[in-house]
Amino acid sequence: MINRLVALLVGIVLVAALGACTPSEAVEVTAKFDDVGDLAKDAPVLMADIQVGQVTDIRLADARAVVDMAIDPQAEVPADVVARVRRTSVLGERIIDLVVPEGVPLSSEPLADGAEISDT
């Protein structure tokens, strides 16, 4: 009985570990901001309040914050999105929110690997 329980627990841990891995086929994109506040590496990237990726790096270049993100290719985020830094609540963590500007038709093309989100 104990052997079965141990085997079950090991199986659950392996499945969880494999599911938590960042897929190597993630779409890597970049956005530049004047200010990101206390945005942290590994912060979620959301679209329509659904997580579609995560922040992989934050660095300074030309007096602006450059944020690298890994986006799930299955999310098919349109190429014309705008990236905004916002809080999840008044005291909550900062996240990246991807939105399509009002009045702008959705692009038929998803974000390409290496793309820069130009409007932030």
Model regions and ranges:
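Structural beta-strand/beta-sheet cores of well-ordered domains, especially the beta-sheet scaffolds
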Residues: 27-29, 94
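Short alpha-helix capping/helix-loop boundary micro-motifs
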Residues: 30-34, 68-71
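C-terminal motif of bacterial Sec signal peptides marking the signal peptidase cleavage site
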Residues: 18-20
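Bacterial signal peptide processing site
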Residues: 22-25
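Sec-dependent N-terminal signal peptides
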Residues: 3-13
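Short beta-strand/strand-turn micro-motif
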Residues: 34-66
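Non-cytosolic, membrane-proximal linker/loop modules
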Residues: 58-120
